[in-house]
Amino acid sequence: LDMCADTPEAVALLRQHNFTISGATFDHGTTTALHWGITDSRGRSAMVEFDHGKINIYEGQDIKVLTNDPPYLQMNAINDYWVKKGGQNTLPGTVSSPDRYVRGYFFDAHVEKTGEADLGVSITRSILNNVSVPYTYTLGDANVSSTQWRSFSNIRDLRYYFDIVTNPGMFYVDLGKCDLRKGASVMKLDTTKTADYV
């Protein structure tokens, strides 16, 4: 998708080709599911869903939260129930994908919207931490595994943030400072490094 100028172009490219995901089955015969978000610099969003080998594409600025299970339309139906119930009094609190989706949707709708980059990073990071599955969590459910990393982007300032749960820091790449022209040298970020400040 790095060949596309914006979300509509990426969606058109995906619709032109018969993309599939192939992979191993997991416990109890479950297959790989994937929800993949695309947002361009104008805030146009799309979500690409691979469900049982079939690609579904949903577009709209209301696509803000993604988890891998269940399929997107079912997830929205579950979320609609909780929106009507009201999250002020009760929110689902398990580590299941639907519960984490509902919490992410609720908090995104009820936090301050800010143009200040650092505050926006802090707010977004706090929501992502709230919907993460703790590292090393095990319960034997084939559909739940611990969160390995979290990522988000500031599309206005062209910064891509991510943290890996085994590294106590957070990384970001300032795409405005990267040479992304064809033929430019390959860049690599060593995510095993940490910085200590005393």
Segments and roles (model prediction):
Residues 1-60:
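Structured, non-membrane catalytic/scaffold regions adjacent to prosthetic-group chemistry
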